[in-house]
Amino acid sequence: MVGLVPLLTACDGVSRATHQTLHVVLVPTGRVEWLQQDFRDQLAWQPLLDNFRQIYPNVHVQLSVHQEAQLNDFLTKAKSRGLGPDLLLVRSPTAVSLLERGLVLPIPETAAVRNALSLLNPTDLSRVRTAKGIAGLPVFKEGTLACYNRTHLAQAPTSIEALQAVAASGRTIGLSVEPIGIWWTAGAFGAQHAMGPIIVGNDGGRKPDLPRDRQALRHWLRSLRAMALQNRVDVGTGPEELTRGLESGRLSWIPCYSITLQRLDRTMGKRLGVAVLPSGPSGLPSPYSSLRVWALGADSSPSQQRLALALMQLSLDPLVQREITLSTRMVLPANRNVQVPVASSGRLAVLAGAQRQFEQGTALMSLPFSADRVQRVLPIVQNVISQVMVGVLSAEQGADRLLELRPRAGAGR
């Protein structure tokens, strides 16, 4: 193993003769907490843990899983007793929120950490760099894809028009009213630049154009309403409902999160097909890419903190990143120097394609934003989308309600 390991073994200052425990908390995305067991037991962690154990044979890494919705309460209570975890694996907005609340520490920019940071794409680093410091160290990326039943469809539709034709032919497709699950359609229908500030609470210095944004939102919502009215379009509340519908054969096509692929591989086998999401009349889709980061616990001893930093840095080692990518085929490496073997893996080629679509979308989604903001706004957005899709609100009324959520000009998150 090359790259980071010499720095770890030479400079960490941790005694290898002392038996210690490193408590690592894994936090699944709130929308996929029903995959909690898969999240803890997946093979992704084994290459990292095996290599860490070779360097620190007397350190026991204790893995536990906590729900995202209860994380603030868990950490607040643990901190009051000085028993918080040493390391947390969370989404980048969650790390930003925890740092703002003082529940995690900023990543110290030591020489070894700066070496690790140099391995990252600047756009990924920008998602965790805040006024209080770096909220977390990126380790891998999860994407939004299209999953389909290969016994029902010979290939995935590449356009929304083709997707609607699938439904018209008698095959049922699934859509989600959950905002992140339907975010891909904002790009396809030309509304992602209008929706970006609403989601992240930051206009990124973009000069507001209210008439243009209102028109874009109306068009998007009208298009979603038209899709919902079509026969054989099943509107679900979230990824669990859609995933189970695909597994059972009731649905032929759904938008899906890459983190669900391990389960779908197990339940569907060769019936599972994976593709990038379809384009629309306004251009490419806007799939969301979730950046997973290590956040540093606030209650560690100096020795435990050095171990936590060592594990974080080791996770970016090229060989570890490559092993994680190849063993799961559902995440992409954060280390920009790791070549993803897209030529030999159709699954990884799809993931890389979805990541390119995300990077070509609005730059606002690559800014640091807080999970607290998202948790306040997304239920309102979901309610508006749901009411428009079932006809309770008109597209015009829905657009006006969404615009009420936008930040003031020049506002931060």
Regions found by a protein language model. Name each.
Residues 4-94, 405-413:
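Conserved N-terminal structural module of periplasmic/extracytoplasmic solute-binding proteins
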Residues 202-236:
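Glycine-centered hinge/linker elements that transmit conformational signals in sensory
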